[in-house]
Each structure stands twice: as C-alpha cells, then as structure tokens.
C-alpha cells in the first residue's frame, strides 16, 4: 500500500507540473507575452523545486510524510486556484512557479524515498530498487493522465477555469491523504524494519545519516551531478515540446497526444529500470538510457525539416522510454548509502540538482 500511495502522489506531483506545456500556448495567445517570459515561469518552478528539497527533506524527517504530503497538496491546490486569476507575469511566477515548485517537491520523491525506505530494510532490502522504480513510474503516469485531461478542460471551458478545476482536485486530494491510516503507513509492522540509526549501518561504510557528513562524501556529489546534468538536458526540451511540435506543423491535439504518449512510455522505462539494473548492472543501463535520450532529441530536431508522424514516433519512443530512468537508480543508491533518520534532508539536498538543472535548462530553452 505504501508503494501505491507514493506512486499516486508522484502521479499528482509531476503530472500537474507538466501541464504547463499545455497551458503555455493559450496563455501566450491571450497575454501576448514572449516565449522567454513564459519559460521563466517553468524555470522558477524547477528552481523552487530544487531549493525546497533540503527543507522538505528536513520536514519529512521531523514531522513525517502525512503532514508533508497534506501540506504539499494544499499548496499545489492554492497555486492553481490563484493562477486562474493571473493577469501579469509575476502572478504566474509566484503561483505556478514558486508555490507549485515547493508543492511538487513536498509530494514527490523526497517524501516517497523516506517513506519507502522505512519499509524496505533488512530482509526486504532486495526489493528496494523495484519499489522505488514503481514509485518513480508514477511521474510518467501523471503526464500520461493529466496532459490530455488538461487539454480537454482548456478546449471545453478555457485555461482559467481549467486551472480552477485542477486546484479543486488537488484540495480534495489533500483531504483524502490526511484521512489515510497513517499509524499503519508511517512505520512497518515488523520492528526489525524500523528506520533507526541501525538501518543503514551494515551495507555501506561510506554512508552517513547526517547531512553535513554526507556533503563530504564523493558519492553524494556524484549522484547530485547525475541529476543536475541530466535535468539541464531534459528541460531544454520538455517544457517547449508541445509548442515546438505545433510550430513545425503538427496540430495542438496531436502535439498534446505526443507529449502524453511520451509520458506513457516513461512509465514502462522507469518501472523496468530497477529490474534491468539488477540484471545487467547500473552502469550499462544508465549508458543505454543516455544513448536513447540523445537519439530522441536528435529525432525531434529533424522534425523541423521533415514534420511527419513516423519521425515524431521514432523520436518520442526512445525519449519517453529513457526519460526519468536514471532517477530510480540514484534514489535506490542514496537510500542504501545514506539510510537513517537523516535520509530526508540528504535526499532533498541531492535533488536540488534536478531543480537547479531544470531551472537552467528551462531558461535556456526560452532564450534559444
């Protein structure tokens, strides 16, 4: 049940945030703002997501997942509810940028990693990588679900009302999460699986459950840089994908479906990563995933000269299957090396690489 909960929360976390790609064109059409101005919204969203990581992780360590998940959904609902009244760039910078970025972190993998690691210690440790991979797959499922839903809402009632509806869904989600049986969810029933300071002591001598000590290890910075560099590359492309496909000649519906299909494929790519890494080694799988990402980006670039559906499919498939596939490997490694009471703060600090890389990548996408 813990993995299902974390999957659903990731579905809301990433899926709601990626709806920006669908809102971009109608907001641009009504407001007349430049693409760079609009890209700044998503850049702030990613920046807030990254900078909030260490704070959210600290909160998870101190007050637990229930409060963080509930508060995050409430903040997300507030951001979208206020965004429907936006008339100036700073309104969106604050709401769907800063507030939504913090909320996305609160209900995303930082909280999920701490919660899942509590349940997959000791005799269950071998199941940690698959559990994290399934949880990560919620991100792709969220894109697959919320992109077409948002497009239908915008086509039916307009982008402002669409933000309002999504805000209500998020508020309702906060109530549901608060009412869940957290006494059973927060701690494993087997005392041998408790996350005391002993939890991470046995398997990795290089690890530490203290953030200050973790920052002095090469493992922390290696994982941080994997997340950072990957995010720069991915977010050079992702926020502008729908607008780009429309600009080269595809219809808005086709572009949205392509982006949704891209999210659909990430579900399988991410879910399979943990198993493949266990069978063939993390290094081989990560290398293969980067090769697929590069192939997908090159394929998207060729659409400027040859905007045909076959080439679009050939670009979306490798890009979708590889996007996010590095995340489960990083999370599982961090959970093993830094298991303990300080895992939330450590993993939150590590995921600052995603936010900062995403912010830089998004800003560059608007400039270019």
Language model regions located:
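Hydrophobic core of transmembrane alpha-helices in multi-pass small-molecule transporters
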Residues: 11, 79, 91-107, 228, ...
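Extracytoplasmic gate region of multi-pass secondary transporters
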Residues: 18-25, 147, 212-275, 361
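Helix-to-loop junctions at the C-terminal end of transmembrane segments
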Residues: 52-65, 269-282
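Primarily marks hydrophobic transmembrane alpha-helices of the MFS/SLC 12-helix fold
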Residues: 66-69, 92, 286
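C-terminal ends and interior cores of transmembrane alpha-helices
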Residues: 74-87, 292-305
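Cytoplasmic helix-loop-helix junction between adjacent transmembrane helices
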Residues: 96-137, 333, 339
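Helix-loop-helix hairpin linking two adjacent transmembrane segments in secondary transporters
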Residues: 134-186
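A late C-terminal transmembrane helix in Major Facilitator Superfamily
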Residues: 335-368
């Amino acid at each position: 049940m813990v993995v299902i909960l974390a999957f659903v929360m990731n579905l809301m976390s990433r899926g709601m945030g990626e709806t920006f790609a669908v809102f971009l064109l109608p907001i641009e059409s009504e407001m007349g703002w430049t693409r760079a101005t609009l890209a700044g919204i998503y850049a702030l969203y990613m920046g807030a997501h990254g900078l909030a990581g260490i704070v959210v992780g600290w909160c998870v360590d101190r007050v637990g997942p229930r409060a963080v998940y509930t508060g995050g959904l409430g903040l997300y609902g507030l951001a979208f509810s206020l965004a429907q009244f936006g008339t100036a760039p700073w309104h969106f910078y604050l709401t769907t940028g800063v507030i939504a970025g913090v909320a996305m972190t609160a209900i995303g993998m930082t909280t999920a990693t701490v919660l899942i690691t509590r349940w997959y210690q000791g005799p269950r440790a071998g199941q940690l990588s698959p559990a994290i991979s399934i949880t990560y797959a919620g991100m792709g499922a969220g894109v697959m679900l919320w992109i077409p839903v948002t497009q239908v809402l915008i086509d039916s009632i307009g982008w402002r009302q669409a933000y309002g509806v999504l805000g209500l869904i998020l508020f309702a989600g906060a109530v549901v999460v608060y009412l869940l049986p957290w006494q059973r969810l927060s701690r494993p029933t087997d005392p041998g699986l408790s996350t005391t300071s002993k939890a991470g002591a046995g398997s990795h001598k290089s690890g530490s459950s203290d953030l200050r000590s973790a920052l002095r290890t090469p493992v922390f910075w290696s994982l941080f840089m994997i997340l950072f560099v990957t995010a720069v590359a991915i977010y050079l492309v992702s926020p502008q994908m729908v607008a780009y496909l429309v600009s080269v000649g595809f219809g808005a519906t086709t572009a949205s479906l392509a982006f949704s299909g891209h999210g659909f494929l990430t579900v399988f790519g991410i879910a399979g990563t943990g198993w493949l890494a266990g069978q063939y080694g993390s290094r081989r799988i990560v290398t293969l995933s980067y090769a697929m990402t590069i192939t997908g980006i090159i394929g998207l670039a060729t659409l400027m000269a040859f905007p045909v559906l076959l080439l679009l499919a050939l670009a979306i498939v490798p890009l979708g299957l590889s996007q996010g596939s590095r995340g489960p490997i990083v999370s599982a490694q961090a959970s093993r090396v830094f298991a303990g009471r300080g895992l939330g703060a450590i993993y939150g600090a590590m995921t600052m690489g995603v936010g900062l890389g995403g912010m830089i990548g998004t800003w560059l996408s608007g400039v270019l």
